[in-house]
Amino acid sequence: MTTFHSLTVAKVESETRDAVTITFAVPQPLQEAYRFRPGQHLTLKASFDGEELRRCYSICRSYLPGEISVAVKAIEGGRFSRYAREHIRQGMTLEVMVPQGHFGYQPQAERQGRYLAIAAGSGITPMLAIIATTLQTEPESQFTLIYGNRTSQSMMFRQALADLKDKYPQRLQLLCIFSQETLDSDLLHGRIDGEKLQSLGASLINFRLYDEAFICGPAAMMDDAETALKALGMPDKTIHLERFNTPGTRVKRSVNVQSDGQKVTVRQDGRDREIVLNADDESILDAALRQGADLPYACKGGVCATCKCKVLRGKVAMETNYSLEPDELAAGYVLSCQALPLTSDVVVDFDAKGMA
């Protein structure tokens, strides 16, 4: 279901020179709908220069039941991030989808775990919520954060992380690595990559001791970190990645199908609708939107999983997938923004969100 609500901006706070935190006021009747699992994101919708824009931003905190916050960092050519910095102000309203995504972790009070987070740049946004909630909810658990930035001045949530370290001095290990700032220790200088993690593993951290690892940041860093953690002994199933979409980047077509004129049945809100694809490379989502369907989506790059649906009948191929887990694929879930029909009897269900 596409569920947007108009939320009022309670405050806009500067985090760094190019990043702001936007806090929305959530009225009491909607607070249950906006209850989130740490690591999930919000999809924001706004009109900019006559065009509707949608972007996903990780929930970074929610100190009160009536508030929820996301952080927006400016990126080169990013229209929504520019809109956020130049136009979003306290008191205005914005269309905000209910929390989505399955990255992260739901803390459990009785659990005693050791967790690792590796982040670079704005990749810290989902980690802040995960770390803060876990340390608060699981009094016997420990967290290590490896956080990479260019300099200390470009570091998002610097004060919030310092406050967490002061609050949990024995349970939070914070390692800040800077690529453009000279430090006494070479170990904390440079970029987070496979070599850096190998060095940390040889002298400071035993990666095999962690129960779960969470990674978020630039694609190259994430790929290096995932490979390094596996080489250092962490099982695949304990490593979780959250990829941010890069606006303007188009994935090269890897699926060659003939779908021009193909009909697909789309089920949403309990109703079936027949759509027709008008090009071999048109996704099910694009075809449905072109024909007036109001389906959930955000990145259109196979990253955020907002457009996830379930194939009830027929066969579908996906061009790329950065967000669905193997068990979701086995259960028949696909990303409609990447889905191309392979047969003439395809039925997809957007109401089936049971594994979200």
UniProtKB/Swiss-Prot annotation:
Region (Oxidoreductase): 112-228
Cofactor note: Binds 1 [2Fe-2S] cluster.
Segments passing through the bilayer: none
One of the GO BP terms on file: phenylacetate catabolic process
Names of required cofactors: [2Fe-2S] cluster; FAD
Example GO molecular function: 2 iron, 2 sulfur cluster binding
GO CC annotations on file: cytosol; phenylacetyl-CoA 1,2-epoxidase complex
Domain FAD-binding FR-type: 2-106
First-level EC class: oxidoreductase
EC number(s) per entry: 1.-.-.-
Residues that hold [2Fe-2S] cluster according to the record: C299, C304, C307, C337
Top-level taxon of the source organism: Bacteria
Pathway: Aromatic compound metabolism; phenylacetate degradation
InterPro entries: 2Fe-2S_ferredoxin-like_sf (IPR036010), 2Fe-2S_ferredoxin-type (IPR001041), 2Fe2S_fd_BS (IPR006058), Beta-grasp_dom_sf (IPR012675), Cbr1-like_FAD-bd_dom (IPR008333), FAD-bd_FR_type (IPR017927), Flavoprot_Pyr_Nucl_cyt_Rdtase (IPR001709), FNR_nucleotide-bd (IPR039261)
Keyword terms of this UniProt record: 2Fe-2S, Electron transport, FAD, Flavoprotein, Iron, Iron-sulfur, Metal-binding, NAD, Oxidoreductase, Transport
Domain (2Fe-2S ferredoxin-type) ranges: 262-354
Record-stated family: In the N-terminal section; belongs to the FAD-binding oxidoreductase type 6 family.
Function: Component of 1,2-phenylacetyl-CoA epoxidase multicomponent enzyme system which catalyzes the reduction of phenylacetyl-CoA (PA-CoA) to form 1,2-epoxyphenylacetyl-CoA. The subunit E is a reductase with a preference for NADPH and FAD, capable of reducing cytochrome c.
Name of the molecule in the record: 1,2-phenylacetyl-CoA epoxidase, subunit E
The species this protein was found in: Escherichia coli (strain K12)
Lineage: Bacteria, Pseudomonadati, Pseudomonadota, Gammaproteobacteria, Enterobacterales
